[in-house]
Each structure stands twice: as C-alpha cells, then as structure tokens.
Amino acid sequence: MSSKVSRDTLYECVNAVLQASKDKKRNFLETVELQIGLKNYDPQKDKRFSGTVKLKYIPRPKMQVCVLGDQQHCDEAKSLTVPCMDAEALKKLNKNKKLVKKLAKKYDAFLASESLIKQIPRLLGPGLNKAGKFPGLLSHQESMTQKIDEVKATIKFQMKKVLCLSVAVGHVDMTPDELAQNVHLSINFLVSLLKKHWQNVRSLHMKSTMGPPPKLY
C-alpha cells in the first residue's frame, strides 16, 4: 500500500515544524504529534480500531515508565533509578479507586514481573486497564533498559467516539530524518488499521506542542 504523502511533502512539513520550534525556543522539549482526521467512518457502527507500533526513534524520551516488580526486578530498577513498586506497595493501595487512578495518572506506562502481572486485577482492580495502561510483561531474560526503551518507542492508535485522533511521533530535538522516519512509519501503520485504508483518511497534520500545524495530507 503506497503512501499518499510524498517524500517532499513529508520533509517540507518536518522542516517547517522543526524550524518553527527553533525560531521560538521553549523552555521544555516540545513533543511532535501526528493529528489525524478520519472520514467515511461511523464510530457507533464501525469497529473501533486500536493498535500499537514500535517506532524507530523514541518519540517521548521523558516518558515515565514504572516497574511493578518482584524483588529482583525492584533491585534492578532501583540501581537504574527507574520508579518501581513491589506487591506490598500495591497492596497498600487497597484497591482504592482514587489511589489507583492517581497511580495511572502519575506514569505513562507500566511493566510488570511475571509473578505480579497475574495478581494486578486482584491487587488493583480494573483501574490501570481502564486508563489504557495495563502493564507489559517484563521477564528476567530481557534487559530492563531495553524493554523500557521499547515501551517508550511504542505508540498506540486508538479510535474513540470522535473522528479525530492524535499521537506523539517525535520531539523537536530530532533530526529531520529521524522525525520523517517516525512519521512515515506511523502513517503507514495507521492506514493499515483502517477499514478502507486511505479512503478513511480525511486529513493528516503534524504539530509540535506550541507550533503551527503544517498539512501532510
């Protein structure tokens, strides 16, 4: 399925976004989003899609990942200064909806040890799941830093009740090539999720947190 966004248009938009952020330096790292408008789609009737794709470059380096770990994982997390909670700490939340909601808000994503992942519904109730942040599995065979980077590089497309959505695909300190590759990957993946592919795409824009939104499509 070929992309309807030409390489030239892609780079024009990427450069416009990066240039705008250089001209007006903010005192925080601006995130770059892909904003998507859909058409010929009825959120009531049509199946709401959701899917995740791993990008080549981490879009949000400051993303906070918390490890819900067994003893070994918690020790490892502490040595890496990664936020971490053990089963005891989770029990203390006592399934309190407010506290679980607060936890879900505090972190962008969670990873959990095998022994803990099965206990999460029992320990925390459905709160993390409702927030769309049910933990990914962290095994002892893989490197924690690699796994965290993988989580940070993964973006999620989720169709809700409205016909527009936006996802973080990068930040303004990326090179044009890095940002362009992430945007290209994101668009192709999104289009593959749509029932009628490009016929469901009304518009695509790119936008940094504070910048103008050049039109990709």
From Swiss-Prot:
Pfam entry (one): Ribosomal_L1
Cellular component GO terms held in the UniProt record: large ribosomal subunit
Biological processes per GO annotation: translation
GO molecular function annotation: RNA binding; structural constituent of ribosome
Record-linked InterPro entries: eL8/uL1-like, Ribosomal_uL1, Ribosomal_uL1-like, Ribosomal_uL1/biogenesis, Ribosomal_uL1_3-a/b-sand
Keyword annotations from UniProtKB, A to Z: Ribonucleoprotein, Ribosomal protein
Tagged with keyword Cell cycle: no
Family named by the database record: Belongs to the universal ribosomal protein uL1 family.
Name the record gives this protein: Large ribosomal subunit protein uL1
Organism annotation: Spodoptera frugiperda
